[in-house]
Design a protein with these regions (language model features):
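Generic low-complexity segments that are intrinsically disordered, proline-rich and/or Lys/Arg-biased
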Residues: 5-11, 547
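Catalytic or ion-coupling anion/metal-binding cores of large enzyme and transporter domains
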Residues: 25-73, 80-101, 106-107, 112-117, ...
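A short, small-residue-rich loop immediately preceding and capping a beta-strand
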Residues: 132-153, 165-168
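Intrinsically disordered, low-complexity serine/threonine-rich segments
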Residues: 5, 22-23, 167
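Short intrinsically disordered, low-complexity coil segments enriched in acidic
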Residues: 1-7, 34
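Glycine-rich, highly charged phosphate/nucleotide-binding loops
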Residues: 117-126
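Short, Lys/Arg-enriched N-terminal segments with co-localized hydrophobic residues
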Residues: 1, 10, 16-27
Length: 588
């Protein structure tokens, strides 16, 4: 159902998949800034950076890094950039490294900093576009690793549309905590806070969690947003196999970075090199969404895939995602989830993303294996080389975790344009639920209320005015959802919000409610005690209040004054759309 918007440029594609290509004989994109008499001053500036005569004949590779030492997913990327730049030089290219910002959602969680997280995605996209346009690189390798950085770089890459490979920093290993029988991660610490409040654990146990759950560099362990998006890059064909699952601190990862660097130089040297949009097409986009449902990715992937599709010129409706979910068996369940689940390291050990795709492709109509990839092979050629599903970490089609995908899109009067729930992480007892609304006007208010005992069994927590426009910035709700879990209410309390959730969230947590409260959505008219009905199997969420009463409430509703009136967030709020369109910025 996906289609391109506008005319497609004709592209010569060598072979069945791939862009094997010939050595370039025509002008390079970088010649715009380095060739000819008029570019003598430009060459003078580049010589000041260390270039010699022979370097002006080589392809220029933009190395888009997101290094910062405050973010564990990015603290090692300075070294990664060095490894990749060295490999580019060895392969005959000239690397030019530049940086984007990177916000750690975990560190920004639960305070005003979280308002900047989603908004940072747009800054990252703009930065990639700006650097790659002001300095016309022949190709680009992107080194993202955290939640908004992956989609932000993807959006920027779509705008530039030059040969591009994504080579992420890799996932963090799972934590091993004394006294805890299962693997731990960031989510374990958040839940530990609530458990400490009600004396389920003591100070020493909480400190042990704090010190061991996040053992080293990498994107947070688990199928959270960053790891989900890095995995989807493999299915999109814009990353080599292993991008989403090879551990950040492993020797295998170092070789992965070198291999990606060598390959981007090969692409740049081709006579007719494939560009980013040659990989991110309607067919590869559908492949990525099927993978998302098969592995039960983060609910935030819905938000980001819609935004990337918009930049790629693809028309994708949120309803399309639910149709794919209904048809896609969930065959791999990685933390965080309910019941039996595994960790990213285990998934990598049994074949990673290619093994998941190999199994899901056995169901007719699921995967289009003819999609090209940056490796030069088709997607089918790539996953054909993967091991068969092991039956435990990656289940077979005849024994899935569920017949439907891990994410579900719900509709109803409370979310006329849709909302999202990670169905794979919902307690079976909460798949259908009806309860009274307990309303909070912000995440901060909700955290205080939940920890203060204002939420009881059976309630439906409503957190509103936290959408892209109303927040502004659409804060993640990991803290309140973790507090619900930590207080032992995960199997009896639901949460509904126009904000979003961390990929670490699990439980009956329904987010991305559209239209949001700030845009006049019905969620802004809910009153304390109103009954809310949730039916995930039938994809509905509704406010059980007579239409006449709703109409009267709507008459008295007025838009609220913006929470922030200066700076970037004020600009962001004025341009942001609701979640059903990816929360992208629209300029009238």
């Amino acid at each position: 159902r996906f289609r391109a918007i506008g005319p497609e440029e004709p592209r010569a594609v060598a072979g069945g998949g791939g862009f094997s290509g010939n050595i370039r004989r025509t002008a390079m994109r970088s010649d715009i800034m380095k060739k000819g008499l008029e570019r003598t001053p430009h060459r003078g500036l580049m010589r000041a950076t260390g270039l010699a005569d022979e370097d002006f004949k080589k392809p220029y590779i933009g190395v888009c890094n997101s290094y910062t030492n405050i973010v564990p997913g990015h603290c090692h990327l300075k070294k990664v950039g060095e490894i990749i730049c060295d490999a580019i030089r060895e392969a005959g290219g000239v690397p030019y490294e530049f940086n984007t910002i990177a916000v750690c959602d975990g560190i920004a969680m639960g305070h005003s900093g979280m308002k900047y997280s989603l908004a940072s995605r747009e800054i990252i996209a703009d930065s990639v576009e700006t650097m790659g346009s002001a300095h016309p690189f022949d190709a680009m390798i992107c080194i993202p690793n955290c939640d908004k950085v992956v989609p932000g770089m993807l959006m920027g890459a779509m705008r530039l549309n030059i040969p591009t490979i994504f080579a992420s920093g890799g996932p963090m290993r799972a934590g091993k905590t004394e006294g805890v029988s299962h693997n731990t991660d960031l989510n374990s610490i958040f839940e530990g806070v609530a458990a400490r409040v009600v004396d389920k654990i003591d100070d020493a146990q909480l400190h042990e969690l704090e010190c061991t759950a996040c053992p080293g560099p990498g994107s947070c362990s688990g199928m959270f947003t960053a790891n989900s998006m890095n995995c989807l890059c493999e299915a999109l064909g814009i990353a080599l196999p292993g991008n989403g699952t090879i551990a950040a601190d492993s020797p295998e990862r170092v070789e992965y970075w070198r291999r990606a660097a060598r390959r981007i130089v090969e692409l740049a040297k081709m006579e007719n090199p494939p560009r980013a949009k040659d990989f991110v097409t309607a067919k590869s986009f559908r492949n990525a969404l099927v993978l998302d449902m098969a592995m039960g990715g983060s609910s935030n992937t819905v938000l980001h895939t819609l935004a990337v599709a918009n930049e790629a010129g693809l028309k994708v409706d949120i309803k399309d995602l639910d149709e794919i979910s209904k048809a896609t068996p969930n065959i791999c369940r990685l933390a965080p989830s309910r019941g039996e689940f595994h960790i990213v390291e285990e998934c990598n050990r049994v074949g990673g993303i290619m093994a998941i795709l190999k199994e899901i492709a056995k169901k007719p109509g699921m995967i289009d294996g003819s999609a090209p990839t940056v490796s030069g092979k088709t997607l089918a050629e790539q996953y054909a080389a993967a091991p068969d599903a092991d039956g435990t970490v990656i289940r077979t089609l005849d024994n899935p975790y569920s017949e439907k995908g891990g994410l579900a899109i719900l509709f109803g009067n409370l979310a006329e344009n849709g909302c999202v729930v990670k169905a794979a992480g919902v307690d079976p007892k909460m798949l259908v639920h009806k309860g009274p609304a307990v309303i909070f006007e912000s995440q901060e208010e909700a955290c205080e209320g939940i920890l203060g005992g204002k939420v009881r069994e059976g309630d439906v927590v409503v957190i509103r005015y936290e959408g892209p426009k109303g927040g502004p910035g659409m804060q993640e709700m990991l803290a309140p959802t973790s507090y619900i879990m930590g207080r032992g209410l995960g199997s009896s309390v639901a949460l509904v919000t126009d904000g979003r959730f961390s990929g670490a969230t699990h439980g009956a947590c329904i987010g991305h409610v559209s239209p949001e409260a700030a845009a006049g959505g019905l969620i802004g008219l809910v009153e304390p005690g109103d009954m809310i009905e949730i039916d995930i199997p039938n994809r509905t969420v509704r406010l059980d209040v007579p239409e006449a009463v709703i109409a009267e409430r709507r008459k008295s509703w007025k838009p609220r004054e913006p929470k922030i009136k200066t700076g970037y967030l004020a600009k962001y709020a004025s341009l942001a759309t609701s979640a059903d369109t990816g929360g992208v910025l629209k300029v009238n």
